[in-house]
Amino acid sequence: GAQVGARDKKVVLIVGDGGFQMTLEEIMMIRQYNLPVKIVIINNSFLGMVRQWQELFKDRRYSFVDLECNPDFVKIGDAYGIKSERLKTKADLENKLKDLILSDEGVILDCIVEKEENVFPMIPAGKTVSQMIGKKGVLEND
């Protein structure tokens, strides 16, 4: 929808592999309407946000977050006729980002990251934006 509403803008979706699976049927629209949407999948084979919460607040007692049987996102993109590629290193990503942004077509980049890579900053339950957890994994203003 963002690309349809802003045809003259570059639209980039940054999404985890779990989140992408919840909405991947939307890529049909990219192909059907030839939309130049760029999709960058952060693929750690986990429901990343939930896993991170379970790591930080539940002593790594992981429950129902492992996505070991992820589909092949590159093959899914290819099946829809969308240019798709898997990246496994930071250098690959840095090299491809420029090509991605300059492309006039829809693109899917499946970026493989460490399984337990965390995303910061984050706001813990019951805290405010001013009490977010920063880069070092500690409360900023507690």
Region annotations inferred by a language model:
Residues A2-D142:
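Thiamine diphosphate
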